Amino acid sequence: MRIRSVLIAAITVIPFSLAAQNISMRPPITGIAKVSVYATDMNKSKQFYGTFLGFPQIASASASAPMEYRVSSKQSIEVQPAPNGTTDYLAYIAFATTDLDSMQRYLTSQKVPVEGDIQTQPDGTRFLWVKDPEGHRLQFVQLPPHGHLLPVSSSSVKNAPQPISQIILHAGFIVHNRAEEDRFFHDILGFVEGWQGGRGHKLEWVDMRVPDGTNWLEYMLQDPKAKNEGDSGELNHFALGVPDIHQAAQMLQHRHWDSSQPYEDPEIGLDGKWQLNLYDPNGTRAELMEFGPVRKPCCYPYTLPVPK
Protein backbone atom coordinates (compact mmCIF):
# COMPACT_ATOMS: atom_id res chain seq x y z
CA MET A 1 0.00 0.00 0.00
CA ARG A 2 2.83 2.33 0.89
CA ILE A 3 4.68 1.51 -2.37
CA ARG A 4 1.53 2.29 -4.34
CA SER A 5 1.16 5.65 -2.57
CA VAL A 6 4.77 6.56 -3.31
CA LEU A 7 4.34 5.68 -7.00
CA ILE A 8 1.17 7.75 -7.28
CA ALA A 9 2.91 10.69 -5.61
CA ALA A 10 5.90 10.37 -7.96
CA ILE A 11 3.68 10.19 -11.04
CA THR A 12 1.78 13.25 -9.85
CA VAL A 13 4.93 15.27 -9.17
CA ILE A 14 6.71 14.51 -12.48
CA PRO A 15 4.35 16.51 -14.78
CA PHE A 16 4.50 19.52 -12.47
CA SER A 17 8.30 19.32 -12.31
CA LEU A 18 8.57 19.13 -16.09
CA ALA A 19 6.16 22.03 -16.51
CA ALA A 20 8.16 24.16 -14.09
CA GLN A 21 11.38 23.21 -15.87
CA ASN A 22 9.96 24.18 -19.27
CA ILE A 23 8.91 27.57 -17.94
CA SER A 24 12.19 28.38 -16.17
CA MET A 25 14.72 27.25 -18.81
CA ARG A 26 16.18 29.97 -21.02
CA PRO A 27 16.29 29.12 -24.73
CA PRO A 28 19.51 29.87 -26.66
CA ILE A 29 20.41 33.47 -27.50
CA THR A 30 22.67 33.10 -30.52
CA GLY A 31 23.65 36.63 -31.52
CA ILE A 32 22.63 40.05 -32.79
CA ALA A 33 19.94 39.83 -35.45
CA LYS A 34 19.41 43.53 -36.12
CA VAL A 35 20.50 47.02 -35.16
CA SER A 36 17.94 49.77 -35.76
CA VAL A 37 18.88 53.45 -35.99
CA TYR A 38 16.91 56.66 -36.42
CA ALA A 39 17.48 59.12 -39.27
CA THR A 40 16.35 62.69 -39.85
CA ASP A 41 17.02 62.40 -43.60
CA MET A 42 16.23 58.97 -45.02
CA ASN A 43 17.84 59.74 -48.39
CA LYS A 44 21.15 60.69 -46.80
CA SER A 45 21.04 57.54 -44.69
CA LYS A 46 20.34 55.51 -47.82
CA GLN A 47 23.48 56.94 -49.38
CA PHE A 48 25.50 56.04 -46.28
CA TYR A 49 24.26 52.51 -45.62
CA GLY A 50 23.49 51.52 -49.20
CA THR A 51 26.03 53.32 -51.41
CA PHE A 52 28.92 53.99 -49.03
CA LEU A 53 28.86 50.85 -46.88
CA GLY A 54 27.46 48.82 -49.78
CA PHE A 55 24.66 46.94 -48.03
CA PRO A 56 21.79 45.82 -50.30
CA GLN A 57 18.38 47.11 -49.29
CA ILE A 58 15.73 44.54 -48.43
CA ALA A 59 12.52 45.02 -50.41
CA SER A 60 9.97 46.85 -48.23
CA ALA A 61 6.47 45.54 -47.68
CA SER A 62 5.14 49.12 -47.99
CA ALA A 63 6.36 52.59 -48.88
CA SER A 64 6.02 53.68 -45.24
CA ALA A 65 8.10 50.80 -43.86
CA PRO A 66 11.59 51.51 -42.46
CA MET A 67 14.55 50.87 -44.76
CA GLU A 68 16.41 47.67 -43.95
CA TYR A 69 19.85 46.69 -45.21
CA ARG A 70 21.07 43.12 -45.32
CA VAL A 71 24.45 42.47 -43.71
CA SER A 72 24.09 38.69 -43.97
CA SER A 73 21.27 36.15 -44.20
CA LYS A 74 20.85 36.47 -40.43
CA GLN A 75 21.75 40.10 -39.68
CA SER A 76 20.51 43.48 -40.87
CA ILE A 77 20.60 47.21 -40.17
CA GLU A 78 17.28 49.05 -40.06
CA VAL A 79 16.87 52.79 -40.61
CA GLN A 80 13.64 54.47 -39.54
CA PRO A 81 12.49 58.11 -39.41
CA ALA A 82 13.53 59.83 -36.19
CA PRO A 83 10.82 60.92 -33.75
CA ASN A 84 10.57 64.65 -33.20
CA GLY A 85 13.03 65.90 -30.62
CA THR A 86 15.05 62.73 -30.29
CA THR A 87 18.69 63.01 -29.23
CA ASP A 88 19.40 59.26 -29.19
CA TYR A 89 19.57 57.77 -32.66
CA LEU A 90 19.99 54.12 -31.64
CA ALA A 91 16.41 52.82 -31.82
CA TYR A 92 16.87 49.24 -30.62
CA ILE A 93 18.98 46.08 -30.75
CA ALA A 94 17.46 42.72 -31.70
CA PHE A 95 18.87 39.45 -30.37
CA ALA A 96 18.24 36.12 -32.08
CA THR A 97 16.79 33.13 -30.24
CA THR A 98 15.97 29.65 -31.49
CA ASP A 99 12.63 29.45 -29.67
CA LEU A 100 10.65 32.65 -29.22
CA ASP A 101 7.71 31.02 -27.46
CA SER A 102 10.03 29.57 -24.82
CA MET A 103 11.74 32.96 -24.53
CA GLN A 104 8.41 34.64 -23.85
CA ARG A 105 7.60 32.10 -21.13
CA TYR A 106 11.08 32.41 -19.65
CA LEU A 107 10.99 36.22 -19.52
CA THR A 108 7.58 36.11 -17.88
CA SER A 109 8.84 33.60 -15.30
CA GLN A 110 11.69 36.02 -14.51
CA LYS A 111 9.20 38.88 -14.10
CA VAL A 112 10.55 40.72 -17.15
CA PRO A 113 7.64 42.68 -18.70
CA VAL A 114 7.00 41.66 -22.32
CA GLU A 115 5.35 44.39 -24.39
CA GLY A 116 2.28 42.98 -26.13
CA ASP A 117 2.11 39.70 -28.02
CA ILE A 118 4.53 37.95 -30.35
CA GLN A 119 4.36 39.51 -33.83
CA THR A 120 5.23 38.07 -37.25
CA GLN A 121 6.82 39.89 -40.22
CA PRO A 122 6.06 39.09 -43.89
CA ASP A 123 9.31 37.09 -44.18
CA GLY A 124 8.26 34.82 -41.32
CA THR A 125 10.46 36.45 -38.67
CA ARG A 126 8.74 36.43 -35.27
CA PHE A 127 9.60 38.94 -32.56
CA LEU A 128 8.69 40.40 -29.19
CA TRP A 129 9.65 43.56 -27.31
CA VAL A 130 11.20 44.16 -23.89
CA LYS A 131 13.17 46.92 -22.18
CA ASP A 132 16.28 46.57 -20.05
CA PRO A 133 16.48 48.22 -16.59
CA GLU A 134 17.69 51.51 -18.11
CA GLY A 135 14.93 51.65 -20.70
CA HIS A 136 16.82 50.52 -23.80
CA ARG A 137 14.41 48.89 -26.25
CA LEU A 138 15.29 45.33 -27.18
CA GLN A 139 13.80 42.75 -29.50
CA PHE A 140 14.05 39.00 -29.31
CA VAL A 141 13.56 37.49 -32.74
CA GLN A 142 13.24 34.02 -34.18
CA LEU A 143 14.36 34.02 -37.80
CA PRO A 144 12.94 31.70 -40.47
CA PRO A 145 14.97 28.49 -40.91
CA HIS A 146 17.04 29.95 -43.76
CA GLY A 147 17.41 33.49 -42.44
CA HIS A 148 15.72 36.48 -44.04
CA LEU A 149 13.49 35.34 -46.88
CA LEU A 150 12.49 38.76 -48.23
CA PRO A 151 14.43 39.57 -51.43
CA VAL A 152 16.62 42.62 -51.75
CA SER A 153 15.19 45.35 -53.98
CA SER A 154 16.13 45.19 -57.65
CA SER A 155 17.31 48.81 -57.64
CA SER A 156 19.60 47.99 -54.71
CA VAL A 157 21.23 45.09 -56.54
CA LYS A 158 21.85 46.96 -59.79
CA ASN A 159 25.33 48.52 -59.79
CA ALA A 160 25.63 47.75 -56.07
CA PRO A 161 29.08 48.23 -54.52
CA GLN A 162 30.72 45.46 -52.55
CA PRO A 163 29.45 45.36 -48.95
CA ILE A 164 32.10 46.55 -46.52
CA SER A 165 31.31 43.73 -44.08
CA GLN A 166 29.30 40.55 -43.70
CA ILE A 167 28.84 40.57 -39.93
CA ILE A 168 27.72 42.80 -37.09
CA LEU A 169 30.21 41.97 -34.34
CA HIS A 170 28.71 43.98 -31.52
CA ALA A 171 26.47 46.86 -30.54
CA GLY A 172 26.86 49.18 -27.58
CA PHE A 173 24.89 51.70 -25.60
CA ILE A 174 25.21 54.02 -22.61
CA VAL A 175 24.95 52.30 -19.23
CA HIS A 176 24.73 54.23 -15.97
CA ASN A 177 24.18 51.39 -13.49
CA ARG A 178 26.24 48.33 -14.30
CA ALA A 179 24.87 46.29 -11.39
CA GLU A 180 21.30 46.68 -12.65
CA GLU A 181 22.27 45.84 -16.22
CA ASP A 182 24.26 42.81 -15.05
CA ARG A 183 21.25 41.49 -13.15
CA PHE A 184 19.32 41.62 -16.42
CA PHE A 185 21.88 40.63 -19.05
CA HIS A 186 24.05 38.27 -16.97
CA ASP A 187 21.79 36.83 -14.29
CA ILE A 188 18.60 36.51 -16.36
CA LEU A 189 19.78 36.31 -19.97
CA GLY A 190 23.11 34.56 -19.44
CA PHE A 191 25.44 37.06 -21.14
CA VAL A 192 29.08 36.58 -20.10
CA GLU A 193 31.81 39.20 -19.72
CA GLY A 194 34.53 38.79 -22.35
CA TRP A 195 36.63 41.90 -21.76
CA GLN A 196 36.62 45.23 -19.97
CA GLY A 197 38.78 48.30 -20.28
CA GLY A 198 39.13 52.04 -20.11
CA ARG A 199 41.51 54.97 -20.24
CA GLY A 200 43.75 55.50 -17.25
CA HIS A 201 42.29 53.93 -14.14
CA LYS A 202 38.69 54.48 -15.23
CA LEU A 203 36.56 51.51 -16.31
CA GLU A 204 34.61 52.61 -19.40
CA TRP A 205 33.74 49.57 -21.50
CA VAL A 206 32.48 46.09 -20.70
CA ASP A 207 31.93 43.49 -23.42
CA MET A 208 29.07 41.11 -22.59
CA ARG A 209 28.96 38.15 -24.99
CA VAL A 210 25.69 36.44 -25.87
CA PRO A 211 25.49 33.05 -24.13
CA ASP A 212 25.22 30.93 -27.27
CA GLY A 213 27.20 32.81 -29.91
CA THR A 214 30.12 35.15 -30.53
CA ASN A 215 28.45 38.60 -30.82
CA TRP A 216 28.52 40.89 -27.84
CA LEU A 217 26.84 43.87 -26.24
CA GLU A 218 29.16 46.65 -25.08
CA TYR A 219 28.32 48.59 -21.95
CA MET A 220 29.47 52.19 -22.46
CA LEU A 221 29.76 53.07 -18.77
CA GLN A 222 28.90 56.65 -17.83
CA ASP A 223 28.47 58.57 -14.60
CA PRO A 224 24.73 58.61 -13.75
CA LYS A 225 24.98 62.34 -13.02
CA ALA A 226 26.58 63.16 -16.37
CA LYS A 227 24.57 64.35 -19.34
CA ASN A 228 25.60 62.42 -22.44
CA GLU A 229 23.11 63.66 -25.03
CA GLY A 230 25.84 65.27 -27.12
CA ASP A 231 27.92 62.09 -27.08
CA SER A 232 25.11 59.58 -27.63
CA GLY A 233 26.04 58.96 -31.27
CA GLU A 234 29.61 58.14 -30.27
CA LEU A 235 28.61 55.93 -27.35
CA ASN A 236 25.49 54.27 -28.77
CA HIS A 237 26.99 52.44 -31.73
CA PHE A 238 27.52 49.19 -33.60
CA ALA A 239 30.60 47.47 -35.02
CA LEU A 240 31.07 45.66 -38.34
CA GLY A 241 33.73 42.99 -38.66
CA VAL A 242 36.36 43.20 -41.41
CA PRO A 243 39.39 40.94 -42.03
CA ASP A 244 41.72 43.83 -42.95
CA ILE A 245 41.05 47.36 -41.73
CA HIS A 246 43.42 49.00 -44.20
CA GLN A 247 41.84 47.31 -47.21
CA ALA A 248 38.42 48.37 -45.91
CA ALA A 249 39.60 51.96 -45.48
CA GLN A 250 41.02 52.01 -49.00
CA MET A 251 37.76 50.69 -50.41
CA LEU A 252 35.77 53.41 -48.66
CA GLN A 253 38.13 56.19 -49.74
CA HIS A 254 37.25 55.41 -53.36
CA ARG A 255 33.55 55.89 -52.58
CA HIS A 256 33.95 59.52 -51.46
CA TRP A 257 31.38 59.67 -48.66
CA ASP A 258 30.29 63.29 -48.17
CA SER A 259 29.94 63.49 -44.40
CA SER A 260 30.01 66.41 -41.99
CA GLN A 261 31.93 64.17 -39.61
CA PRO A 262 35.73 64.14 -39.94
CA TYR A 263 37.24 61.07 -41.53
CA GLU A 264 39.28 59.10 -39.02
CA ASP A 265 42.32 57.00 -39.84
CA PRO A 266 42.52 53.36 -38.72
CA GLU A 267 43.97 52.90 -35.25
CA ILE A 268 44.59 50.13 -32.76
CA GLY A 269 42.06 50.34 -29.94
CA LEU A 270 42.78 49.69 -26.29
CA ASP A 271 41.39 46.20 -26.80
CA GLY A 272 44.32 45.51 -29.15
CA LYS A 273 42.25 45.41 -32.35
CA TRP A 274 42.50 47.55 -35.47
CA GLN A 275 39.43 49.74 -35.86
CA LEU A 276 38.08 52.60 -37.94
CA ASN A 277 35.30 54.90 -36.76
CA LEU A 278 32.70 56.03 -39.30
CA TYR A 279 29.61 58.14 -38.62
CA ASP A 280 26.23 58.10 -40.34
CA PRO A 281 24.45 61.39 -41.22
CA ASN A 282 23.03 61.65 -37.69
CA GLY A 283 26.34 60.95 -35.99
CA THR A 284 25.70 57.32 -35.02
CA ARG A 285 29.06 55.57 -34.94
CA ALA A 286 29.46 52.65 -37.33
CA GLU A 287 32.74 51.14 -36.22
CA LEU A 288 34.79 48.87 -38.46
CA MET A 289 36.80 46.35 -36.45
CA GLU A 290 39.18 43.51 -37.21
CA PHE A 291 38.26 40.17 -35.70
CA GLY A 292 41.31 39.55 -33.53
CA PRO A 293 43.81 41.65 -31.56
CA VAL A 294 47.25 42.42 -32.97
CA ARG A 295 48.67 43.31 -29.58
CA LYS A 296 47.92 42.79 -25.91
CA PRO A 297 44.90 44.77 -24.64
CA CYS A 298 45.65 47.75 -22.46
CA CYS A 299 44.08 47.09 -19.16
CA TYR A 300 42.55 43.68 -18.67
CA PRO A 301 43.10 40.36 -20.45
CA TYR A 302 40.36 38.74 -22.48
CA THR A 303 38.40 36.36 -20.26
CA LEU A 304 36.83 34.49 -23.19
CA PRO A 305 38.41 33.22 -26.43
CA VAL A 306 38.43 36.00 -29.04
CA PRO A 307 35.94 35.23 -31.86
CA LYS A 308 37.60 34.68 -35.24
Describe the function of each predicted region.
Residues 27-76, 172-217, 274:
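Core segments of cupin and vicinal oxygen chelate
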Residues 21-27, 30-40, 67-70, 82-167, 173, 195-199, ...:
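Vicinal oxygen chelate
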Residues 179-182, 186-268:
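Structured core of small recognition/catalytic domains
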Residues 75-77, 83, 119, 215-219, ...:
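Intrinsic, low-complexity N-terminal interaction/targeting segments
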